Amino acid sequence: MAIEAKVVWSEGIFITPQHFQQFERYLESGLRQLAVSQEGHFWGFSSLVLNSDGLKRGVIGINEAEGVFPDGSVFLFSQKQLENLSLKVPANIKDTKICLAVTLPSSVNNEIYFPDQDSSDSCRYKAFNKTLADTTNTELDGRQVTLADLNPMLVLENDLTSGQTALPIALIRSSSADFEIILDESYIPPCLGSQKQPHLKAYISEIYGLLMQKSNSLANAVNDPNTGGC
C-alpha cells in the first residue's frame, strides 16, 4: 500500500474536514509502512485468546487479541470491542480458516460507522461518544467528542474481500450438520512471539531440553578418562 500524499498547508486556504482526514491518512499510512518495512513478515498476533464456549452451537469468538495486521495496522482490541465479536459457522464445512479482519483504509469510501446506521461490515472504524477533559485546565467542564475504534469482524477465509486485511485465528477441521465446530488443535496462527503461543512454547521447551541433554552427555564424555577425555 502506497504512502498517502501530504497536505499542503498554505496561507489563506479554506480548511475543511477533508484536509484533516487526508492529513490523518498521510500520518497513518507512513506508520503502517514503517511497521511493514521493519521486516518482511512483521505481522501476526502478540496475544490471542479464543472464546470457545459456543463451539457446540457453531459459534466462535475472541476474548483477547493484540498484534499487527499484514498491512501494518497495529491493534489491541478492548473487551468492549470483542464482547459482541463472534461468527456463526455454517454447517458441513471443513478445512477452512476463520480470520480476524478489518476493512483497509480508503479515501473514497465511508470509513466510519455510526450507531444509527444499518450495517458496520464495510466500515474500518466504529464511532462512539466520550466526554474528554481539557488537560490544560481540568477545572473546566468536559466536552463530548466523537471518537472511533477499529471495527473488527470474524469471517471465513473464503469470504474475505480485496478490501480487507486479515489474520487467521483458527482452522476448522469440520462442522457437523447440527453446527458443532471441531477445531484443528495443532493449528498455529501467525505469531510475533513464541511465549504466548502454547504450541510454539512447548516446541521450544522440548528442543531446549534435548539440547541440554545432549550437552550434558557430551560434557560427561569429554570429562571421562575412560573414553579419551581429560
Model-derived features with residue positions:
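Mixed-charge (acidic/basic) macromolecular-recognition segments
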Residues: 124-230
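N-terminal accessory/cap region of cofactor-dependent oxidoreductases and related radical enzymes
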Residues: 84-156
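Glycine-rich, compositionally biased intrinsically disordered regions
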Residues: 2-116, 222-230
